[in-house]
């Protein structure tokens, strides 16, 4: 045997040993959840601004929850920032991503200012996307009123050791917390699809996401708080202070840096855009006009989803029957859409029952994860043949859409995760229609039954599916895929994936050959 082949054999055996060790000892190698249990603070009648603002509204609508759809990125930023400014008791923040960029720093500053007022701030972040942010997180965690915990964290925080830990614990670290919630005083909550970062709040200069949240006020907020507490106190969660050293001096330096940054032209320009947005004024003046909904709740996966033997507790078991129960129309929005054999069968079965079934997802050009598009493309012809309508979001808009907030940057990508059935039952949250959301990541969202709220979500679907935003996908008489652009006169028909370059199309096709669908 040649020396090269010998080295390769030893390397393969070493890698196999690492993987076997990970399978056998992953739980022992993982940092153990050891933070003291803590729970949502008790509600009070009029102790905080949110208590006082909501009291007359909730008295007028007993046992109902107020719900406002946030489909505008600037309004979504304002809802978080302004609600934090009114906090007087607690801020519970749970996110998959929190970027160290303009909007991430501005919202971190709001959390710090709340803590300075005596508000208890709990931040729960997924550790995969917190990589590289230890210095900032440890600085914030040094504040006596702020505690940061990480979901399924790495023991090794950087470098080669972190890479090796990824290999050893590959199965365990593949499970991530995809939840998104911003909960204020136990009275109001923003739940939906947005992470914290410029691209989610119409602040990015290149590509911004079309996304959707729900601002909740009233009883359903208790559901969100219970979800947060279950995760916060689970053994999958570790305080950042146990993974690094806190530095109070670094906190003051970081706050000074962020505060100085708010005076820069970039920040001032963005904040002026936020203030000029019509919907933001409703938050400023507290002239809110929510839907008042009796049948509404926040639902989620269990925090230890990878250990859950009873899959009836998985969120998909709650959501799938709602879609399967459609009688006239099912409209689904998912940026990462990989229905698999079962999902394709469910949607085409509905279509055979004369249910109008439609899906809005990203086109190849608009998708920020081409591998996911390759997973979707496997099922495109079968979906169309089964009567499912497909609409793919374009990377650039037409007409008014081209100059809207969504397309005001150089490009756009869909990030909304929602569906509405029969115009009244629906879901808005973090759950993508793909295998990763079904079985690997934890997810959460708002499930409701209300005609007004359903009509608003249906209108959002219809707008995204319309010619200003999307291509209509179909097969011609010979069964070949075509993309129709109804935004031109006459309509333009594309014979290949529109707006996607040759290399991107080739890459997406090659990715179809890889056995990675379960990871998408």
Positions of predicted regions on the chain:
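Charged, low-complexity intrinsically disordered terminal segments
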Residues: 2-180, 184-520
């Amino acid at each position: 045997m040649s020396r090269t082949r010998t080295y390769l054999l030893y390397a393969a055996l070493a890698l196999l040993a690492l993987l076997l060790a990970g399978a056998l000892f992953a739980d022992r190698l993982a940092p153990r959840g050891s933070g003291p249990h803590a729970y949502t603070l008790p509600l009070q009648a009029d102790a905080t601004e949110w208590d006082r603002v909501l009291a007359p509204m909730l008295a007028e609508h007993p046992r109902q929850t107020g719900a406002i759809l946030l489909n505008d990125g600037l309004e979504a930023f304002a809802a978080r920032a302004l609600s934090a400014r009114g906090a007087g008791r607690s801020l519970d923040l749970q996110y998959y991503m929190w970027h160290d960029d303009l909007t991430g720093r501005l919202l971190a500053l709001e959390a710090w200012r709340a803590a300075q007022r005596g508000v208890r701030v709990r931040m729960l972040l997924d550790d995969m996307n917190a990589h590289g942010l230890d210095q900032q997180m440890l600085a914030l965690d040094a504040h006596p009123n702020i505690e940061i915990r990480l979901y399924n964290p790495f023991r090794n925080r950087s470098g080669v050791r972190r890479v090796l830990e990824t290999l050893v614990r590959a199965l365990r670290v593949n499970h991530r917390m995809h939840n998104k919630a911003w909960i204020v005083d136990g009275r109001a909550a923003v739940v939906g699809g947005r992470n914290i970062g410029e691209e989610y709040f119409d602040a990015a200069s290149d590509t911004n996401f079309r996304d959707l949240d729900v601002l909740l006020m009233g009883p359903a907020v208790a559901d969100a708080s219970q979800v947060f507490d279950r995760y916060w106190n689970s053994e999958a969660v570790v305080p950042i202070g146990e993974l690094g050293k806190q530095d109070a001096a670094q906190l003051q330096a970081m706050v000074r840096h962020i505060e100085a940054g708010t005076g820069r032209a970039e920040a001032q320009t963005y904040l002026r855009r936020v203030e000029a947005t019509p919907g933001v004024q409703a938050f400023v003046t507290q002239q809110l006009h929510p839907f008042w909904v009796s049948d509404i709740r926040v639902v989620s996966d269990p925090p230890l989803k990878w250990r859950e033997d009873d899959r009836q507790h998985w969120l998909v078991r709650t959501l799938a029957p709602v879609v399967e129960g459609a009688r006239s129309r099912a409209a689904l929005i998912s940026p990462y859409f990989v229905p698999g054999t079962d999902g394709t069968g469910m949607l085409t079965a509905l279509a055979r029952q004369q249910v109008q079934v439609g899906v809005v997802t990203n086109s190849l050009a608009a998708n920020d994860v081409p591998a996911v598009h390759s997973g979707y493309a496997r099922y495109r012809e079968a979906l169309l043949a089964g009567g499912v309508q497909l609409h793919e979001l374009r990377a650039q808009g037409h007409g008014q859409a081209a100059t809207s907030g969504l397309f005001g940057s150089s490009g756009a990508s869909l990030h909304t995760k929602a569906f509405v059935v029969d115009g009244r039952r629906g879901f808005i949250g973090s759950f993508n229609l793909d295998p990763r959301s079904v079985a690997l990541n934890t997810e959460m969202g708002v499930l409701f039954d209300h005609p007004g709220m359903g009509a608003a979500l249906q209108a959002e679907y219809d707008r995204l599916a319309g010619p200003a935003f999307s291509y209509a996908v179909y097969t011609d008489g010979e069964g070949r895929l075509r993309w129709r652009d109804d935004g031109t006169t006459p309509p333009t028909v594309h014979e290949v994936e529109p707006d996607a370059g040759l290399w991107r199309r080739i890459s997406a096709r090659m990715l179809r050959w890889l056995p990675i669908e379960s990871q998408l």
